Amino acid sequence: MSVQSSGVLLAPSKNLSPEVGRRCANFHPSIWGDHFLSYASEFTNTDDHLKQHVQQLKEEVRKMLMAADDDSAQKLLLIDAIQRLGVAYHFESEIDEVLKHMFDGSVVSAEEDVYTASLRFRLLRQQGYHVSCDLFNNFKDNEGNFKESLSSDVRGMLSLYEATHFRVHGEDILDEALAFTTTHLQSATKHSSNPLAEQVVHALKQPIRKGLPRLEARHYFSVYQADDSHNKALLKLAKLDFNLLQKLHQKELSDISAWWKDLDFAHKLPFARDRVVECYFWILGVYFEPQFFFARRILTKVIAMTSIIDDIYDVYGTLEELELFTEAVERWDISAIDQLPEYMRVCYQALLYVYSEIEEEMAKEGRSYRLYYAKEAMKNQVRAYYEEAKWLQVQQIPTMEEYMPVALVTSAYSMLATTSFVGMGDAVTKESFDWIFSKPKIVRASAIVCRLMDDMVFHKFEQKRGHVASAVECYMKQHGASEQETPNEFPQPVREAWKDINEECLIPTAVPMPILMRVLNLARVIDVIYKNEDGYTHFGAVLKDFVTSMLIDPVPI
């Protein structure tokens, strides 16, 4: 029995059972208030005029891209600029055609400079072509070391550094190249007179492979504009397109914010994180393209509900209550609400409403089968939350072998990846869902990136408030390691997980590339948000700036 999507939500909980001993996280409230409700207006006639201008500029850039030109180096520069400025989604087939031609007929010249060779390698790998990394032997000396003369070529070093982040297992030369370029680029940042110093600092913090394309585009506008050889039509296209898309995203977030405000979780469930804006930012990193508007809406609602459920299990619920909630989700029936404590009813009813909305839309499209996979993914999520709650109840610190299978599920990345497919239209088939339920390597790798990066930055806060043991505590107990040295053990598994992700994105792929991109982008979001802190839970200046640049401030034309 499915829940009807209409109806009134239950009244606020009058009693959150203060007499029961409960943990408290003291999460700070949302910093955004009702700001995004003000973006409810539709597109204007001025926007229609801008759209026409964008179409004209797109045709101009398309002609440049497809022009017969034997200068492949110039084509590489053009493609790189298109991608880094965030408008590659307009030219996907054209870019693939050009790069496929380069891959099929590529003969790497020993005379090619390190900048061009690295750029070619990166763009081809990014497109899924398994170009050999042996070409980088051309830049080694007779003793097998990278030539020291390369260190003076900062532009070339930066290009090689970016290329190394596409490495897969067994490519030792790229591991060496990463260490070599990192050392020399760090040295270059000490010379502020270097015109590339700002780019180098940014790249060392956020390499292209791990960055969010739209966020990186916002950064790259000024870099590209400062280049005297920049293409004026391409830059204008990128800026106009960014601003038009930003208006679309603002309208979407306005609608989602209104839905969230109506739920009133900030008052009904004050122990939980109020982070719907941050949730939308997260999902915008998964797909920003206009055709995925429905996918963004439902995935944002699902991740927002998951955040509330996570806090019920982590922060507020007793084990007996959590058992009841787990059983209710297993039943997935509105009648199960009667067995729940009052505060849980608000969440449970809202959860079923969200999936009812998905069900209605999928029924219209003749894709109702997708709802089964989305529900099962959420059920798996809640089961894993309950397993962790049982560990906490008895103060159990599991071994890493016991912890990771459960913690990879509670990272929510398998569930989010599954749900991200639901609204993707014709790009996804039943086989796509069967594939993700087979626990493919790329999904596991994305979850490893999420879990370990989260645990590295969040474990101290979690232990203060009485949270289930993180990977840090599990490793410390199992290996007798100190709290200071344990976090140093996790960057390597994260690096290996990124190699798995890169490997799974090489042709022939198990599923079409648009599907893999959702999983890749989920890993990218984690790298951006959790690099030095939990930017989701403890909202700081960095994430505030990211949200502002993507969702509030337009690009100056």
Swiss-Prot record:
Keyword check for ATP-binding: no
GO cellular component terms, A-Z: cytoplasm
Cofactor detail note: Binds 3 Mg(2+) ions per subunit.
InterPro entries from the UniProt entry: Isoprenoid_synthase_dom_sf, Terpene_cyclase-like_1_C, Terpene_cyclase_plant_C1, Terpene_synth_N, Terpene_synth_N_sf, Terpene_synthase-like, Terpene_synthase_metal-bd, Terpenoid_cyclase/PrenylTrfase
Residues binding Mg(2+) 1: D310, D314
Pfam family, one: Terpene_synth
Residues noted as binding Mg(2+) 2 in the record, renumbered to the chain: D310, D314
SUPFAM superfamilies assigned to the protein according to its UniProt record, in alphabetical order: Terpenoid cyclases/Protein prenyltransferases (SSF48239), Terpenoid synthases (SSF48576)
Binding site for Mg(2+) 3: E462
Coiled coil: none
Comment, domains: The Asp-Asp-Xaa-Xaa-Asp/Glu (DDXXD/E) motif is important for the catalytic activity, presumably through binding to Mg(2+).
Family: Belongs to the terpene synthase family. Tpsa subfamily.
Protein's name in the database: (-)-germacrene D synthase
Species in which this protein is naturally found: Vitis vinifera
Source taxonomy: Eukaryota, Viridiplantae, Streptophyta, Embryophyta, Tracheophyta
